[in-house]
């Protein structure tokens, strides 16, 4: 399977990137700032916050942060804060995505999966509204969508 092989190659490349450690409560990314960096979770746990509200907690190694800022050339749209001591592989985002097709494929696959899941949740939400589902059921679907939009999950070989 090509993606599995590419993930193995990507993991080997990640081992060549610097690793940065963040302590509990330390800010990893700050909304409104530009860092130009892609951060790939090596180990630990972080929370993603939008306007001070936690929209996701991420513990999965391989999760990517900062990709939207790099791809759209805009400031970060969320705060990311360490929930426990966390380590990240750090890469210059623009350089990595421009010269490394495997890195680009990895980020594109993550974004495509997130978009597909968000689209499915939107369909579910529309059905719930049309059929008059209870408000708490609709709220659960909205929360699910917020999680999908708030975090970038790693690609795994299936």
PLM features per residue range, with description:
Residues 1-158:
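Cytosolic regulatory regions built on CNB/CRP/Popeye-like sensor folds
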């Amino acid at each position: 399977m090509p993606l599995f092989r590419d993930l193995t190659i990507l993991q080997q490349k990640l081992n060549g990137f610097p690793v940065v450690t963040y302590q509990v409560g330390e800010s990893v990314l700050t909304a409104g700032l530009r860092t130009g960096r892609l951060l790939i979770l090596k180990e630990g746990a972080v929370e993603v916050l939008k306007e001070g509200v936690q929209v996701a907690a991420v513990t999965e190694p391989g999760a990517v942060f900062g990709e939207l800022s790099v791809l759209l050339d805009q400031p970060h749209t969320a705060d990311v804060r360490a929930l426990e001591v966390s380590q990240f592989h750090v890469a210059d985002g623009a350089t990595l995505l421009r010269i490394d097709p495997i890195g680009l494929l990895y980020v594109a696959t993550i974004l495509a999966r997130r978009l597909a899941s968000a689209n499915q949740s939107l369909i579910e939400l529309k059905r719930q509204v049309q059929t008059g589902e209870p408000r708490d059921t609709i709220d659960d679907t909205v929360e699910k969508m917020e999680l999908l939009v708030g975090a970038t999950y790693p690609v795994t070989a299936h």
